[in-house]
């Protein structure tokens, strides 16, 4: 039974001035008999995606028996889709990028089970751009969040596919032959 009156995930209240509840992620899938995966958006608190003391901008694994959770990915902006092919042992995640740069990411299942955090780069790397209105309001945003087009050159995992302009990516599913 997953529902419990006890908290299994605790909030971190060090959000920044750009907090916005519509970048919330929120996909849940079953990983195995004891674990589920949950995507959590960055809520426009970009700096928290790289902060391992925060759950914003992460995918977490929650043990349904113990309610314990672990971060399995960091550097996510707004993960919308998760698809786990149990037969072929691969996990695909879809994510909204900023002003373009929607991504399809491959997540290493073995690293999830070995408790290795996989980092996808947000807000340091992205194929997308800062929204023009944000740049107008804060011209120094590139100093804090540069959005390098390469992920791998900065120590992050490259998406297997990115879309510019944005396609408004959401859930991902497998279609039969």
Segment roles from a protein language model:
Residues 2-30:
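Asp-box/WD-like beta-propeller blade repeats and closely related beta-sheet repeat scaffolds
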């Amino acid at each position: 039974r997953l529902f419990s009156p006890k908290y299994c995930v605790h909030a971190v209240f060090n959000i920044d001035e750009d907090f916005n509840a519509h970048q919330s992620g929120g996909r849940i899938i079953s990983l195995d008999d004891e674990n589920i995966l949950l995507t959590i958006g960055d809520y426009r608190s970009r700096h928290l995606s790289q902060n391992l003391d925060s759950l914003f901008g992460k995918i977490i694994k929650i043990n349904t028996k113990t309610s314990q959770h672990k971060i399995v990915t960091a550097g996510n902006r707004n993960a919308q889709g998760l698809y786990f092919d149990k037969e072929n042992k691969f996990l695909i995640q879809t994510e909204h990028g900023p002003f373009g740069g929607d991504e399809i990411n491959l997540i290493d299942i073995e690293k999830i089970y070995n408790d290795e955090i996989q980092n996808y780069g947000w807000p340091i790397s992205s194929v997308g751009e800062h929204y023009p209105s944000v740049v107008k309001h804060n011209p120094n945003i590139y100093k804090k969040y540069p959005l390098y087009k390469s992920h791998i050159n900065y120590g992050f995992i490259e998406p297997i596919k990115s879309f510019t302009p944005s396609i408004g990516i959401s859930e991902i599913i497998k279609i039969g032959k």
